[in-house]
Amino acid sequence: MSEQIYGIHAVNAFLANAPERLIEVFVLKGREDKRLNPLLDELQRLSISVQQVNRQTLDNKAQGEVHQGIIARIIPQKELNEYDLNELLQHKSNPLLLILDGVTDPHNLGACLRTADAAGVDAVIVPKDKSATLTAIARKVACGAAEAMPLIRVTNLARTMRELQDKHQIWIVGTAGEATTDIYTSQLTGAIALVMGAEGDGMRRLTREHCDQLVSIPMAGSVSSLNVSVATGVCLFEIVRQKLSR
């Protein structure tokens, strides 16, 4: 069984992080692109098969998504779970985690992974149910972060949150528009897990109940909420700012 990824950034990042999982690459015949040429040279050096194909073939493989003239077939990555999370946390002091509850849009998942990687998050945690999977779309939007950022899928999110609190002493901060405390007046240092809910519905009830603290993002304009990936960036970089200013 194989998967595919597309886009120059996504394939380049995959080549840098997991070249052993690249099966073959399809590129647009006759395309001249200074960003593409170094990538093709490296693929040739590693003896990875590269096929020159026409645009219709690439369009069909990408199913209408923007592929930038390159698609790669890859071996799927092993799915990480609760046991991998515990192993990861044993080697971290003051970890920063991101929990996505009910984020089902692969574009949003990819954007959140990219933001999490930029903010130095140690792992992103999602439930197995009601969550986007790491599709080719998510990988492309993540611009390489999907290969670098551990994505942990857990069977029971509430139970995982309890274990983070009890076993690893991680403070769990949930975001909610109606929270009376905003993120800028909250103390967010130490070991932190930030929980972001789905757009519109927010966090599920049980997820909310397992948060140690709820915070909001102050909104000054006429819109009532932000896209989940934008809100994730706002919150993560406020946490980073506080950690750096300690």
Curated annotation (Swiss-Prot):
GO cellular component: cytosol
One Gene Ontology term of the molecular function aspect: RNA binding
Pfam families, A to Z: SpoU_methylase (PF00588), SpoU_sub_bind (PF08032)
Chain sites annotated for binding S-adenosyl-L-methionine: 197, 217, 226
Entry keywords, A to Z: Cytoplasm, Methyltransferase, rRNA processing, S-adenosyl-L-methionine, Transferase
Top EC class, one word: transferase
Record's keyword annotation contains S-adenosyl-L-methionine: yes
EC number: 2.1.1.185
Lineage: superkingdom: Bacteria
Catalysed transformations (reactions): guanosine(2251) in 23S rRNA + S-adenosyl-L-methionine = 2'-O-methylguanosine(2251) in 23S rRNA + S-adenosyl-L-homocysteine + H(+)
Subcellular location, record wording: Cytoplasm
InterPro entries on file: 23S_rRNA_MeTrfase_RlmB, Alpha/beta_knot_MTases, Ribosomal_eL30-like_sf, rRNA_MeTrfase_TrmH, SpoU_MeTrfase, SpoU_subst-bd, tRNA_m1G_MTases_N
PANTHER family in the cross-refs: 23S RRNA (GUANOSINE-2'-O-)-METHYLTRANSFERASE RLMB
Function: Specifically methylates the ribose of guanosine 2251 in 23S rRNA.
Family, similarity comment: Belongs to the class IV-like SAM-binding methyltransferase superfamily. RNA methyltransferase TrmH family. RlmB subfamily.
NCBIfam families in the record: PRK11181.1 (NF008386), rRNA_methyl_3 (TIGR00186)
Name of the protein: 23S rRNA (guanosine-2'-O-)-methyltransferase RlmB
